[in-house]
Amino acid sequence: MSIALPCVVCRGTVIACNGKYTDAVGFDWAHWSQKTFGAPVFLMNDAAAALLGEMRCGAAKDTDAAILMIGTGIGSAAAQDRRILTGRHGTMGMLGGHMAIEMLHPRRCTCGATGCLEAWAGTWALDEIARQEDGFAESALANARKVDYRALLDGVAQGDAVSLRVFETVATALGMGAVNLIHAYDPEVLLLSGGPCHSEMLMRRIRRYVRENVWTPWGQVDIRVAENPEGSVLLGLIRE
């Protein structure tokens, strides 16, 4: 049995979770699985599983790649020689959402740190970012119960000024995160995954930021949208 979790996993143990599934930390998964199902269990970070699935039969097939997953938070993973990087403690490549991208106006992240990418581009952060904009009450976003990527992109499509300013902030943050991953892990391909990546406007803006700011003397990293965002995690969990 295989399970993907939005947590830091090291040697079959969940060692850290940020806000969700806190009872998974230190839980004896092996004992539980044997007792409940009579079978061993394999645990994996969800972004790492998604990247592995895309490398097996998706947008990163036969390449060294990194992934940035945009959802409630921001997940990431990286691979070298077709193997997921984990490091000594399981965190290598997994904390892209918590790379610091902002110093002058640092926002508090759910992890407790300030300036994290996730605090500027995770779905959970969008509502607060939008409501702090001048003119929010008169903007298209004011009609949303809670501002998320769908509401933001709808506002952008309407030409709403506040939506456009928030979009620029968020897209720039994602571009910074992409550059950080490229500089850190030297991938041939950078995958972007998650519902917001279906926006061609967002993808263009991220690609432009990367093109203008990345330093890769060997050439340009190929930035792609995940082919199978709904199924790549399952494909990555298949044990060979």
Where do the model's predicted regions map?
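ATP-binding/phosphotransfer module of carbohydrate and carboxylate kinases, centering on a glycine-rich
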Residues: 1, 9-14, 31, 35-39, ...
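A secondary-structure boundary/capping signal
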Residues: 4-5, 17, 70
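Short glycine-enriched, charge-decorated loop/helix-capping segments at active-site entrances
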Residues: 15-22
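A structural motif shared across PLP-dependent enzymes of the aminotransferase-like
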Residues: 22-30
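General beta-strand structural signal in soluble alpha/beta enzymes
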Residues: 41-45
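Short acidic loop-to-helix transition motifs that present clustered carboxylates
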Residues: 48-51
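Glycine-rich phosphate-binding loop of actin/hexokinase-like ATP-binding domains
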Residues: 63-120
